[in-house]
Curated annotation (Swiss-Prot):
Residues 1-24 are annotated as: Required for Lys-174 sumoylation. It comes from Homo sapiens (Human). The 9aaTAD motif is a transactivation domain present in a large number of yeast and animal transcription factors. Keywords: Acetylation, Activator, Cytoplasm, Differentiation, DNA-binding, Glycoprotein, Isopeptide bond, Methylation, Nucleus, Phosphoprotein, Transcription, Transcription regulation, Ubl conjugation. The modification Phosphoserine is found at residues 231, 288, 325. There is a cross-link at residue 174 (Glycyl lysine isopeptide (Lys-Gly) (interchain with G-Cter in SUMO)). Residues 46-67, 79-116, 157-178, 218-271 are annotated as: Disordered. The gene is CEBPB. A motif (9aaTAD) lies at residues 116-124. Residues 47-59, 160-171 have a biased composition (Pro residues). The lineage of its organism: Eukaryota, Metazoa, Chordata, Craniata, Vertebrata. Residues 275-295 are annotated as: Basic motif. This is CCAAT/enhancer-binding protein beta. The modification N6-acetyllysine is found at residues 43, 129, 132-133. One of its GO terms (molecular function) is nuclear glucocorticoid receptor binding. PROSITE patterns: BZIP.
Length: 345
């Protein structure tokens, strides 16, 4: 709008009219000084400054059918078919944005040259139909933004990229209770004063390095076995992490092979105890075999009994079927009057 006013000096508004003419002013109608003379009590309206006095008016054919004392602004020659240009945003003197250089105001031109001038201006500003002009403001770097953070006020814009959120707290690490008993530490300190301290100092580090890849939530049963842990490649294996406590447990608990060897007792086959045990086992085996034979005999006897009963029932069914057939034949041979009298009875 400022550019249009600068191009056409006749568009400058006159001093504010009295309240009677405010309704006409809303409709963008402007009145000349001689029209407002009556409103100021017969006195001429205050004249505009020499720099803002209107030039020669264009003929009435260009502005359309309007009154003698009225002038309307026809924006049709100023508008491009593609759309009106957007006014650049006002630059603020803050530390957040860099003020863009103000565009030079164009010199006034005649009404016949407005269309060519605007088309050239739009082509320079927007770079053609399919090109968009970049924004006329820049953003401050991170260092400058941090230095000027205290000078920001609520009206300033916030940076595009918000600060990254704080990292989540590490998950709770849960280890097996009694993984490193106190007696093991005592044996290490008593056995090797120099080397035991180094192993005791290195073992917690290995345990922590291994536990870093096995974080379990509180309340779940966490274990350090290879089946439940999923460690990425390049991490210490569970066997390496458990090597020091295995050596420590060797004195406290025997190995599985030792347990098996202790479970097997050396028995002399020529002793009386061995003979008595063998006799008891033989007697138990004979009893179990005799019981199995008795069960087989009882089963066979029961099968024979059921087979005989089945044959007897089949014979009885055959006999009853024969009797039924004879009775049917008898009823068929009886005369009908006898059957009718027997039915009334």
């Amino acid at each position: 709008m400022q550019r249009l006013v600068a191009w056409d000096p006749a568009c400058l508004p006159l001093p504010p009219p009295p309240p009677a003419f405010k309704s006409m002013e809303v409709a963008n109608f402007y009145y000349e000084a001689d029209c407002l003379a009556a409103a100021y009590g017969g006195k001429a309206a205050p004249a505009a400054p020499p720099a803002a006095r209107p030039g020669p008016r264009p003929p009435a054919g260009e502005l359309g059918s309007i009154g003698d004392h009225e002038r309307a602004i026809d924006f049709s020659p100023y508008l491009e078919p593609l759309g009106a240009p957007q006014a650049p945003a006002p630059a603020t003197a803050t530390d957040t944005f860099e003020a863009a250089p103000p565009a030079p105001a164009p010199a006034p031109a005649s009404s016949g040259q407005h269309h060519d001038f605007l088309s050239d201006l739009f082509s320079d500003d927007y770079g053609g139909k399919n090109c968009k002009k970049p924004a006329e403001y820049g953003y401050v770097s991170l260092g400058r933004l941090g230095a000027a953070k205290g000078a920001l006020h609520p009206g300033c814009f916030a940076p595009l990229h918000p600060p990254p959120p704080p990292p989540p707290p590490p998950a709770e690490l849960k280890a097996e209770p009694g993984f490193e008993p106190a007696d093991c530490k005592r044996k290490e300190e008593a056995g090797a004063p120099g080397g035991g301290a180094g192993m005791a100092a290195g073992f917690p580090y290995a345990l922590r390095a291994y536990l870093g890849y096995q974080a379990v939530p509180s309340g779940s049963s966490g274990s350090l076995s290879t089946s439940s842990s999923s460690s990425p490649p390049g991490t210490p294996s569970p066997a390496d992490a458990k090597a020091p406590p295995t050596a420590c447990y060797a004195g406290a608990a025997p190995a599985p092979s030792q347990v098996k060897s202790k479970a097997k007792k050396t028995v002399d086959k020529h002793s009386d105890e061995y003979k008595i045990r063998r006799e008891r086992n033989n007697i138990a085996v004979r009893k179990s075999r005799d019981k199995a034979k008795m069960r087989n005999l009882e089963t066979q006897h029961k099968v024979l009994e059921l087979t005989a009963e089945n044959e007897r029932l089949q014979k009885k069914v055959e006999q009853l079927s024969r009797e039924l057939s004879t009775l049917r034949n008898l009823f068929k041979q009886l005369p009908e009057p006898l059957l009718a009298s027997s039915g009334h009875c």
